[in-house]
Amino acid sequence: MNDDSETADDSLAAPTDDLAWETTDTRIDYSCPGFDIRMDDVRLPDGTETDFHYVDEPAAVVVLPFTPDGDVVVIDEWRQAVGRTNRGLPAGGTEPDDDDYAAAARRELAEETGHEAEAVEPLVTVEPANGIANSVHHYFVARGCEPSADQNLDFNESIRPTTVGYDDLKRAVLAGEVRDARTVLGVLYYELAGE
């Protein structure tokens, strides 16, 4: 047996603070509904002073919702940034007073699809773009999802819910037909976790 005290998990740990940047000031450069652009004045480890801009947004929840029959509730949503309708999982930003992400996942599922879940379980939490944003996405698997009410969309959402077979969704992800990264990550992680 190796006498080294470093374990496999230790080798994956965050690097030591000698790589850290010191934030000397921070401010919002631009604000819009949903996110801000923040600018930090920073001092790099070698002493260089510069600024760093990034997207500053609230945590988000992403839901992989299964019906009692094992189908998945997905949404078709217009995405202005890419100029097309996008198929994906229900998702949305949290509210400032949200301290229960599972409850936020239930709320987003109901608002975007009109479905309620019998059970909601955490799947994974990720930082999807931590080089340019402070985003944190909390993924949940929802089971026993059934329509219960009308959608309650935000003013800037164009969403049509539908259901697809899970195997069809997985095939579409693997074939590159689903380009929404949140959906790709959710389906692939669900598969890797052996759910």
What are these regions (language model features)?
Residues 1-21, 85, 122, 130-134, ...:
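Nudix hydrolase/Nudix homology domain
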Residues 28-33, 127-137:
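Acidic pyrophosphate-coordinating catalytic loop
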Residues 39-41, 65, 141-143, 165:
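Short, well-ordered beta-strand micro-motif
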Residues 81-87:
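A conserved beta-turn-beta hairpin within the catalytic core of GNAT-like acetyltransferases
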Residues 88-123, 140, 156, 165:
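The catalytic Nudix box helix
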